[in-house]
UniProtKB/Swiss-Prot annotation:
Type-I myosin implicated in the organization of the actin cytoskeleton. Required for proper actin cytoskeleton polarization. At the cell cortex, assembles in patch-like structures together with proteins from the actin-polymerizing machinery and promotes actin assembly. Functions as actin nucleation-promoting factor (NPF) for the Arp2/3 complex. Plays an important role in polarized growth, spore germination, hyphal morphogenesis, and septal wall formation. Residues 963-974 have a biased composition (Polar residues). The keyword ATP-binding applies. This is Myosin-1. It comes from the Eukaryota. The modification Phosphoserine is found at S371. Residues 1092-1153 form the SH3 domain.
Length: 1270
């Protein structure tokens, strides 16, 4: 229910999964529940409100203000208004289009605060409360005749049938049967009156039964107060029950032939009021709906035939006419009508004559049966007997139909809860009111009493009982009126009526006079007045005057034994079903009167309603003319007063909207507090009251929004309750989101892992084709040509199209188009180079060109493309195009130069070309010729300088030549190259980098496969134990100083990746002294025992290997020995890069750790060859000089250790690393335990100097040791 007068701050909040609750304001500026951010989109899409949709928001509470608001909304087609949970409905007398499926769906799963007032909202609330709280519900619809009670009941049934779910066929069948009861019971129980074209002339309480899933499994209907007198007579402009007009107008020919059915004008019971039609109602179509409804509820064709046989009998009984005979007694005027009635009832015609014209009288004496006399009836008495028979047949037939419907609607499963819908005709005040109006108004008084007890009195009584502070409201309790009618002591109206019937039962007039005398005893009651032949009862709806005449006869409600005997003599089994009771001729007890029956029925109804949680719909009739847009303020104001709407508004404004026992409240909302629940389980150990307090505290409900009673918690506004419901729904919604997030995280993690595997695989295998092509180039040269050092790099790949001639866009496309190369051709090779150009009278000189090699099925050429400037414009054109098949040979030298010639032998000179990627060109050309390339490698280059004139170009090795070849006078000067047998070096290992997280954001794994951060990332420095300041070491021993990053857990809680060099620098810094010039301190105290040093080895010879499990080392390096094998191989680790691998034992010399001495002498000046670790290029040069004097290193053992038995740390893969595991470590305790040893533990004075002396000694004696080994 959106309010246009909501104070600033009142917001709306949508609930998850279909239900929403609004956090609207309480009304004094406070906001119920937790404040929410206003959503402008919601406000902008809301329909503009007319007046106020809840009367509790009226600024002035009065009957006139309520009337004005209802009128304003009625004029704008807004017929529904709230009073808290009570719905006020004004009958529009026309179709507003507000009951369509689209409108129904808009109310599904919504609370009343977020949708406009509607009967669908009441139905949704009742259904939701039944499912959520497992309480039986009932909807009490009250109001006067013609106010729209029946329509409201039908819409509630429509909504519940639509939203109650259930795809099972039996459940759907139950829904269909429940909906089918409407047209069926309306046909037999509704009629046109002066005030209403479809007035319910009976009371109906429909109880829908549901299983634990909220699916309808059955229903039960209880009917009250059928107005059977309407069967035999109606006032002008009213009609009999609808079924008579439907049957007479639209009966099929079968029934017309069997039962003699004619038009309604032919029957007394349907023509007495001279009203045969209802505006806007098609009786024929309604009859088809009735027949269809009979089929839906399972009524067989035989049963339908019997029902219509009884209807025909009633119509024909009404046509029996009487006249006085010579004795003044009643005589039937047309025997043929009696004979047809006898045919329909399947009895003897003579028995019908006797039952209608003669009454059996029995005399008794001394308690014994006496004589039986046949007393003739006069015409008035005969007509009364005739009408009594018709009324009895129709009344019993209606009860049979209701019972038949209940039989079909019997629950087909266990019943958990129910929703009841009460539709009973409302308060009636006519010009002449009789016994029927008294009964109707009495039942409405009982319903009003329920409303007072459940909404007003019970409200205040509960507040007092629970010791809740609130302002009491005065109200009118109509219990005194109910007591006036139903009490026995002192006797009420019904008791006086029964006494008059028992005292003067023979004469109706005498009985009526006796009744008037009994009423005089009620004159002292302030709600009763007795007048001549009438009495007035002051009902809650107004004063009603009742006529005494005929009340006693109507109260007797006794079918003569003659008529019961007639029914008992029928050979029709259905008639026996309608009149099952056998006549007990000896029973002298007074049968129950009509007032006794209606009193018992009303009390049973009240007891049923009191067992359920009620919802109220108060219907209002805007005018007596059934006009669509007419609003009679006087009539509506009267209804507002007797419905007690003003008191209802006042009590609602002063009370609490929701109350619940502590245990049920905690059971419903314990999920909202982390102290009362964990993972969906109830964890509170205290009592229910303390648990309820904790829930309200943790949900931030203001203290003024609730009160704690003795056994219940009271919530002031519905907005607060809806906020709790919203939070409860959001709890499950959030749990679902967590599961979804975890699942999406898993999928993302799986995809990320697959991508990384694919990326690694592409990185490992994507360049294999280029590497294979490069290795093929070595075979093409046949080991006859020296190689350039850059050509043997491990990172060299034969990529082919270096200029990008085959690409779209860029300079390559310009060359492609300028040279006239077809776009569909396959570019094998393109590169920039030079061609030797000969000019007349001048020496030849190289000129830049672009070489393109392409092959297709139809075009296989070598293009030589020239770029020239013509008028300052770049011109690109193919200078020469050589078919690949025309190339007889390729001539090149055996030195490392880049010159070669394509020997064609045509009319043009052979091109002499200079290309840095010559080997790759030879390889592609070989493949294009399918291995038939004639490559000539000699000490010179041959080519046809002119057609038929073979020329040679010398290639000489010039030690003074630069790295760039030079051509002069048919001689090419080049420097020395790598040996012709050289092959490409292994692919270099990429630089080790920190691993990236496997996933991003707040997902499962923040780091590598282990879920932690990268070990290469910056970590807090380990706590250093206090130690004495070391003595300065020689510069030759100290590593170069490097800045050490200051890292602390508090300053950097998250590791930051750093380059390996930075990590290594930090390690070396810890190994060095902080100063080399500081004065020596006094002798230090005793130091703790030094940590055990890990075995180290010095590298004696260079060892290069392209195997992934072998470690390449350089002479003079120090490596850490991880393990030793007895087959000549040691597993070592490079202390700088933390890379492990196998190394020949003969290439290493294990270093013996010297024991620390207390005070070593200062070392002598360091000699150039005394450096312990050759860390600079200068030191490397010294080692190279020393290597010239040493013999060749020994060959590595032929057999390496079995790698399957030991896992060797692989070389770091290409950056970026996919794993968070790093072989580099800050200390020996981290990582895998094979990290670089931390020399900080040996940083004492004695240990440092001793290690320096030992290293210097080994360096000086290394040459002799090597000679001894070889």
């Amino acid at each position: 229910m959106g309010h246009s007068r909501r104070p600033a701050g009142g917001e709306k909040k949508s609930r998850g999964f279909g239900r929403s609750k609004a956090a609207a304001d309480v009304g004094d500026g406070r906001q119920a529940g937790k404040p929410q951010v206003k959503k402008a989109v919601f406000e902008s899409t809301k329909k503009k409100e007319i007046g106020v949709s809840d009367l509790t928001l009226l600024s002035k509470i009065s009957n006139e203000a309520i009337n004005d608001n209802l009128k304003l909304r009625f004029e704008h087609d807004e017929i529904y208004t709230y009073i808290g949970h009570v719905l006020v409905s004004v009958n529009p007398f026309r179709d507003l289009g507000i009951y369509t499926d689209r409108v129904l769906e808009s109310y599904r799963g919504k609370n009343r605060l977020e949708v406009p007032p509607h009967v669908f909202a009441v139905a949704e609330s009742a259904y939701y409360n039944m499912k959520s709280y497992k309480d039986n519900q009932c909807v009490i619809i009250s109001g006067e005749s013609g106010a729209g009670k029946t329509e409201a009941a039908k819409r509630i049934m429509q909504y519940i049938a639509s939203v109650s779910g259930g795809s099972d066929s039996s459940i759907q069948q139950t829904k269909d049967m429940v909906l089918a009861t409407n047209p069926l019971l309306e046909s037999f129980g509704n009629a046109k009156t002066l005030r209403n074209n479809n007035s319910s002339r009976f009371g109906k309480y429909l109880e829908l039964e549901f299983n634990t899933n909220g699916e309808p499994v059955g229903a039960n209907i209880t009917n009250y107060l059928l107005e059977k007198s309407r069967v035999v007579g109606q006032i002008t402009n009213e009609r009999n029950f609808h079924i008579f007009y439907q049957f007479t107008k639209a009966a099929p020919q079968k029934y017309r032939d069997m039962f003699g059915i004619q038009q309604p004008q032919s029957y007394l019971y349907t023509s007495r009021s001279k009203c045969y039609d209802v505006p806007g109602v098609d009786d024929a179509a309604e009859f088809r709906d009735t027949i269809n409804a009979m089929g839906v509820i399972g009524m067989t064709e035989a049963e339908q035939d019997e029902v219509f046989r009884m209807l025909a009998a009633i119509l024909w009984i009404g046509n029996i006419q009487f006249a006085e005979d010579d004795s003044g007694n009643a005589a039937i005027t047309d025997q043929s009508v009696v004979d047809f009635v006898a045919y329909l009832l399947e009895v003897d015609a003579a028995q019908v004559n006797k039952a209608l014209t003669i009454r059996l009288m029995e005399t008794a004496r001394g308690g014994r049966r006496g004589s039986v006399y046949e007393v003739p009836l006069n015409t008035v008495q005969a007509l009364a007997v005739r009408d009594a028979l018709s009324k009895a047949i129709y009344f019993n037939l209606f009860d049979w139909i209701v019972g038949r419907v209940n039989s079909s609607l019997t629950a087909r499963g266990s019943v958990a809860n129910s929703i009841g819908i009460l539709d009973i005709y409302g308060f009636e005040i006519f010009e002449k009111n009789s016994f029927e109006q008294l009964c109707i108004n009495y039942v409405n008084e009982k319903l009003q009493q329920i409303f007072i007890q459940l909404t007003l009195k019970a409200e205040q009584d509960e507040y007092a009982r629970e010791q809740i502070q609130w302002t009491p409201i005065k109200y009118f309790d109509n219990k005194v009126v109910c007591s006036l009618i139903e009490d026995k002591r002192p006797p009420g109206v019904f008791a006086a009526l029964n006494d008059a019937c028992a005292t003067a039962h023979a004469d109706s007039g005498a009985a009526d006079n006796t009744f008037v005398g009994r009423l005089n005893f009620l004159g002292q009651n302030p709600n009763f007045e007795s007048r001549q032949g009438q009495f007035i009862v002051k009902h809650y709806a107004g004063d009603v005057s009742y006529a005494v005449e005929g009340m006693t006869d109507k109260n007797k409600d006794q079918l003569l034994k003659d008529l019961l005997n007639l029914a008992g003599s029928s050979s029709n089994q259905f008639v026996h079903t309608l009149f099952p009771n056998q006549v007990n001729q000896d029973d002298k007890r007074r049968p129950p009167t009509a007032s006794d029956k209606i009193k018992a029925s009303a009390n049973d109804l009240v007891a049923t309603l009191m067992k359920a949680q009620p919802s109220y719909i108060r219907t209002i009739k805007p005018n007596d003319n059934k006009a669509p847009r007419e609003y009679n303020q006087g009539n509506v104001l009267h209804q507002i007063k007797y419905l007690g709407l003003q008191e209802n508004v006042r009590i609602r404004r002063a009370g609490f909207a929701y109350r619940q026992t502590f245990d049920k409240f905690v059971e419903r909302f314990y999920l909202l507090s982390p102290k009362t629940s964990y993972a969906g389980d109830y964890t509170w150990t205290g009592d229910e009251e303390s648990g309820a307090r904790q829930i309200l505290k943790d949900t931030s409900i203001p203290a003024e929004e609730y009160q704690m009673g003795i056994t219940k918690v009271f919530v002031k506004t519905p907005e607060t309750l809806f906020a709790l419901e919203t939070m409860r729904d959001r709890y499950w919604h959030n749990m679902a989101i967590r599961i979804q997030r975890a699942w999406r995280n898993y999928l993302r993690y799986r995809i990320e892992c697959a991508i990384r595997i694919q990326r690694f695989w592409r990185r490992m295998t994507g360049g294999l084709e280029f590497i294979k092509l490069r290795d093929q180039g070595h075979q093409v040269l046949q080991g006859k040509k020296e190689r350039r050092r850059m050509s043997l790099l491990g990172s060299r790949r034969f990529l082919g199209d270096y200029v990008g001639v085959g690409n779209k866009g860029g300079p390559g496309e310009m060359i492609h188009n300028g040279a006239g190369i077809n776009g569909s051709e396959n570019i094998l090779f393109s590169c920039r180079g030079e061609v030797l150009i000969s000019k007349f009278g001048r020496s030849s000189k190289p000129a830049p060109r672009i070489f393109v090699l392409l092959t297709t099925q139809t075009n296989r050429h070598v293009y030589i493309v020239a770029q020239t400037l013509v008028n300052n414009q770049l011109q690109i054109a193919s200078e020469r195009t050589i078919p690949i098949g025309a190339i007889k040979s390729v001539s090149t030298s055996n030195l490392k130069d880049d010159w070669f010639s394509l020997v064609v032998g045509g009319q043009e000179p052979d091109p002499l070309m200079n290309c840095v990627f010559k080997t790759e060109f030879f390889t592609h050309l070989t493949n294009a010729l399918r291995g038939q390339l004639n490559l000539k490698i000699a000490d010179h280059i041959e080519y046809n300088k002119k057609p038929g004139k073979l020329a040679t170009v010398k290639v000489v090795k010039d030690p003074g030549a630069s790295n760039v070849d030079s051509y002069k006078s048919s001689t090419i000067h080049t420097s020395a190259g790598e040996p012709p047998s050289s092959v490409s070096k292994p692919t270099p290992r990429p630089k080790q980098v920190a691993a990236r997280p496997v996933t991003k954001g707040k997902l499962l794994r923040p780091g590598g496969p282990g879920g932690g951060p990268s070990k290469l990332a910056s970590r807090p420095a380990p706590a250093r134990q206090p130690m004495p300041q070391p003595t300065p070491q020689p510069a030759a021993v100290q590593p170069p100083p490097a800045p050490r990053p200051a890292v602390s857990p508090a300053a950097q809680p998250r590791p930051v990746p750093q380059p390996v060099a930075a990590v290594a620098a930090a390690q070396h810094t810890r190994n060095a002294s902080s100063s080399s010039t500081r004065a020596p301190p006094p002798p230090p105290p005793a130091t703790p025992p030094a940590a055990q040093r890990k075995p180290m080895a010095k590298v004696l010879y260079d060892f290069n290997s392209d195997q992934s499990n072998e470690l390449s080392i350089r002479a003079g390096d120090l490596v850490q020995i991880v393990s030793k094998e007895g087959n000549g191989w040691w597993l070592c680790m490079n202390t700088t890069t933390s890379v492990q691998g196998w190394t020949p034992e003969a290439y290493l010399e294990e270093q013996v750790a010297a024991s620390p001495k207390p005070a070593p002498p200062p070392p002598p000046p360091a000699a150039p060859r005394a450096s312990p670790v050759p860390a600079t290029n200068g030191a490397a040069a010294a080692v190279a000089a020393k290597a010239k004097a040493k013999p060749a290193p020994p060959a590595p053992p032929a057999k390496r250790p079995n790698m399957a038995g030991r896992k060797v740390a692989p070389a770091p893969p290409a950056a970026p690393r996919d794993s968070a595991v790093s072989m580099n470590s800050h200390d020996s305790s981290g990582g895998s335990g094979r990290g670089t040893p931390n020399s900080a533990s040996n940083a004492s004075l004695a240990g440092g100097l001793a290690e320096a002396l030992k290293a210097r000694q080994h360096a000086m004696q290394g040459h002799h040791d090597e000679d001894d080994e070889w």
